[in-house]
Amino acid sequence: LVLCGAVPVYVNPEVDKRLGISLGMKREQVEKAIKEHPNAVAVLVNNPTYYGICSDLRAIVKMAHDAGMLCLADEAHGTHFYFGNGLPVSAMAAGADMASVSMHKSGGSLTQSSLLLIGPNVHPGYVRQIINLTQTTSGSYLLMSSLDISRRNLALRGRQVFHQVADMAEYAREEINAVGGYYAFGKELCNGNSVFDFDTTKLSVHTLDIGLAGIEVYDILRDEYDIQIEFG
């Protein structure tokens, strides 16, 4: 933002008060922001959020394009959307113009490696020029090799792997919710707007109903059960 001089306009999503997490962007919120700022050049959307919440990306892309704007997607946690049956729509399939995909998060490549996907409305030569101005021209061949190896692995096994992951996460959700006191949320949050879709490979567990904060459960699982979770 500093380098390009852009002035951001934030669309604040709703918050689920019970879970304490941000939801997706409502269609009417995006439409209102576009109408109030007709000179904006792009709309930036998370697909999904950290907790697996997805906005109505196809509708947002259409609104942006109808207003002469690009739609850019932060798909840091959505690598697997390109390989999963029954998973939310990927940014490029929804018609987004660019998507940053963190392959190292769920695609299996080395940390720091990611992909920038470009649609037909964006000139790749211009993107290359900007990249050369903002980062090293001496790229890491170790990271690039890991991206290519991971790409091949996903091309060959991605659908099978992520189908299995989704099944395992759904099984865990059912078992955790059967215990009582915990809430592993899933597609029941979907409301057709601020939660348009949900990433079923995500396993997030609300623990406050048993009197424990997430960080406390994190420490218990790690210290007493040798289970390392991602975030608490």
PLM feature segments, named:
Residues 6, 66-69, 96:
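A short helix->loop->beta-strand "cap" motif at the edges of active sites that frequently abuts
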Residues 8, 71-72, 229:
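Hydrophobic beta-strand scaffold residues
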Residues 19-80:
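Active-site phosphate-binding strand-loop segment of PLP-dependent enzymes
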Residues 150-173:
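Structural signature of PLP-dependent enzymes
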Residues 170-232:
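Conserved C-terminal alpha-helix-loop-beta "cap" of PLP-dependent enzymes
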Residues 1-2:
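Conserved PLP-anchoring active-site segment centered on the Schiff-base-forming lysine
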Residues 90-129, 135-146:
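Active-site PLP attachment segment
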